[in-house]
């Protein structure tokens, strides 16, 4: 009897606990449709919009790295651009949270959702699809010490809005890391260092002038013998 109870508890633990459902979003907030066999990440300082190609799936799971409240506004559209209904819930498996999207029938099209953003982006692909990372407008990864890309992309291009796009083909099991910054950040830093240098020169000049003035005053006093 105890063995059966332990087995039941183990099965529940492995299958996960289902949390309340997540409200779906509006497809108009995303740059849909996506691209076949591709996952696209539109980076932003406050959020990341993800568009993932799904082929003939009754359900799909997405790992949630942060709190469960950070998985927001999920939508699904088919290849014809029609909005597809789905149930979205949060499940916990082996102490890890996943967003579970369940469709009424096998679905092919694009799933989009929003997750937290920032100037540092990390993603570990688990399949062999193409990964596209789109930086915000007027941002880049090009300046050493301020930005970096790991591993080296297979292609770097720009879209019609001038946004930088990083592309990895067959990126399975390659941890992708991107840090980006504003295009004018190096110039701003140059101005800052220049201002600090000018201030340092002013302080040095004032110090040198004060020392010289005191030295002359001492030499003048030494010319007159003490009585």
Residue ranges and their predicted role:
Residues 1-27:
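Hydrophobic secretory-pathway targeting helix
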Residues 17-226:
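Lumenal/extracellular ectodomains and adaptor appendage modules
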